């Protein structure tokens, strides 16, 4: 099931900054629409988030560059 809005994302993802949530949602939807399982969609979506954001203590912050 595709996510239409960030508010529909799992609770763990909703704790991310809005930009990271959008990256996760768009990536998850793309992988899922290509026939990927939920687990594969989530794994690839987290990888996409981690390319642009990093965890600093308890917070996620945008990577420089």
Regions picked out by a protein language model, each given a short descriptive name:
Residues 1-65:
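C-terminal alpha-helical interaction appendages
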């Amino acid at each position: 099931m595709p996510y239409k809005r960030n508010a529909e994302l799992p609770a763990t993802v909703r704790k991310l900054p809005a930009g990271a949530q959008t990256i996760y949602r768009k990536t998850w939807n793309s992988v899922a629409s290509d026939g990927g399982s939920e687990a594969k969609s989530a794994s690839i979506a987290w990888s996409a988030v981690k390319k642009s954001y990093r965890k600093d203590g308890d917070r996620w912050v945008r990577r420089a560059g």
